[in-house]
Amino acid sequence: MADPSYTGRFSSNVDFLNGYSEYHDGDAKEVSGIETPDDYTVVFHMAKPKIDAESTLGIQKICSAKTLKYKKGKTSNVEKNNSNPIGTGPYKLKSFSKTEGASLDRNENFEAKDGEYQISKIMIKKTETSTEIKELENGTVDYIPDVVDANKINTVAKDKDKGLTMDSYPSDREDFLFMNTAAGACQDQAVRQALAYGFDREAYIESYYKLDDKDAKLAYVPGLFGNPVSGENSAYVRGEEKADGATYYDYDVEKAKQILDDAGWTVGSDGIREKDGQKLSIKFLAAKEKDAMDTMIPMLQKQWGELGVDFKANTMEFNTVISTVGDDSAVGDWDVSYLGNSFTSPEDTGVDYFIQSQGVNNFARLKDDELDSYLAAGAYTADKDASAAAYLKAYVRQAELCAYLPTDGVQTYCLRNKKVKGLNTSSTFIWSQSMATAYIDD
């Protein structure tokens, strides 16, 4: 990750170590901040503090010198090896197919404690979203994680006599619209804010996330774009508390229209707004695999249409969406898109990938010096309180810029056959991490 030829997304995982610059930019032959005093110890020396250093460095995998055998400036061989997984963990990969899934067998060389890793085989199966519940009922699938589709949850809730059940917990996931700040109408901050005020997110949630159990809550409108399971800022992100000075986009059609009026976007004879000869046209790009689009797209069509927006939606395969929004040569092909992100940890640093100017997932192409300064202050410190305060400022600043609009946070449901037990999952501890205690009760 410190090599100058590294093309991956995780260079920030090591760029704060002593010797990084000398290795990455100079002629140093090794990173001086990494020491191995014996066969079982790795010592890291940091050039500057980083709030997530312990978790970031602590999850790096240990592998053989054979796998990492390469010359500086030539990491291509290491990258090729990424498609040939190795390891000394409790399971080993038996087969893998991009179209069908994967299978893993228990590693006979792994010394597990008594009672751990009782499941001998794991099969990860690619299924159609429209038939996965039927497969769960038929027994061809035993476990479906991270379900937020109300219809599927309702089906399992009714089918408990068929041997099905579910677990639930607050999700680390936040779904969001992101707006293209580099091309098209959404370059104008006023347009972004108007679109935010003009989308009734509460109505969307009530329509899409509707459980039969009236006391159960599946989703909520987040307050800010950020990590919903943040150790310090989760209440602000989830909207349970208000942050001082933050912009909150409660549905307000008249306010949205006024913002556009004030910004010079006037309604033309055809009902579509325009400014300086440019029509207020929004090209919406979304993944067709997402069931939510059947609800969201008609709502955006109607509600943004009321603002004088020429709305055009296009759905395509998820991977095509990602490649399109990430391609600078295609920056004029879309204006707004929809994605979700699972933050996986209680640290705020995961948001850097999206809203930092050089963030690898900054699909909105947001660039703001003030925002970057808050993110840097939050990341490069060892003071937990100072980090939380800086990230909250970043969340508030991003809300004002409105490149990312959080649409829904959810309660995650994991649907399973009752015979699968011992999966002690949570928002930051997924099923694969829980295999030590999982077992099949036949």
Regions found by a protein language model. Name each.
Residues 3-69:
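Surface-exposed binding/hinge segments that line
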Residues 98, 248, 265-340, 412:
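Ligand/substrate-recognition segments at binding pockets and active sites
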